[in-house]
């Protein structure tokens, strides 16, 4: 939305180019040997200072079945999804949105698409794990500081929403 352009402009001055970070992170992780994520071939941008006005990304086409097109997921596939996200975290990246449309079953392997170029904080990793539980029923067994920060942040937001007379999320 246009109302967010000013916010994005100033954020880019402080944090830098989101798409370029994602491009470099993906390249680094693939060079480290983690090949589950899709590859980038080209990133072309039109910028004002560090703010990206327009961009074009050419990414790897992954032949396979999107998990959203599978009526049921086997325990084996769920295990591979969990392992792919945990490996992604070990390599210093987060998914940011691990729903069924962002995974492709290619042969017998899980591939991850539509990644986040955001900093892999403990809270973002915890959010990935909780999203796996919500979308796939994959139990989150990690109760670290990121998990508790995320849970209490959500509780605080819901409390403030109730005070304002809004529905909780």
Predicted segments with their positions:
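A short, flexible beta-alpha/helix-coil linker loop
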Residues: 6, 64-67, 118
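Conserved ATP-binding subdomain of kinase catalytic cores across diverse folds
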Residues: 1-62, 90
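C-lobe/activation-segment region of protein kinase-like
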Residues: 105-169
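A generic fold-level signal
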Residues: 51, 98, 124-127
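Conserved kinase catalytic-core helix
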Residues: 19, 25-36, 65-101, 106, ...
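Histidine- and aromatic-rich ligand-binding microenvironments
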Residues: 57, 65-68, 134-136
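Generic alpha-helical structural signal
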Residues: 23, 79-82, 126, 130-133
């Amino acid at each position: 939305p246009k109302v967010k352009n000013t916010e994005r402009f100033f954020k880019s001055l402080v944090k830098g180019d989101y798409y370029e970070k994602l491009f470099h992170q993906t390249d680094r992780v693939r060079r480290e040997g983690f090949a589950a994520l899709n590859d980038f071939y080209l990133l072309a941008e039109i910028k004002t200072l560090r703010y990206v006005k327009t961009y074009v990304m050419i990414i790897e086409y992954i032949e396979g079945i999107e998990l959203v097109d599978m009526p049921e997921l086997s325990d084996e596939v769920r295990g591979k999804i969990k392992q792919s996200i945990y490996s992604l975290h070990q390599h210093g990246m987060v998914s940011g949105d691990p729903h069924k449309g962002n995974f492709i079953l290619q042969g017998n392997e899980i591939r991850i698409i539509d990644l986040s170029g955001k900093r892999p904080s403990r809270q973002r990793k915890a959010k990935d794990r909780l999203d796996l539980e919500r979308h796939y029923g994959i139990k989150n067994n990690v109760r670290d500081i990121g998990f508790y920060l995320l849970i209490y942040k959500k509780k605080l937001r819901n409390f403030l929403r109730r005070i304002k007379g809004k529905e909780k999320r």
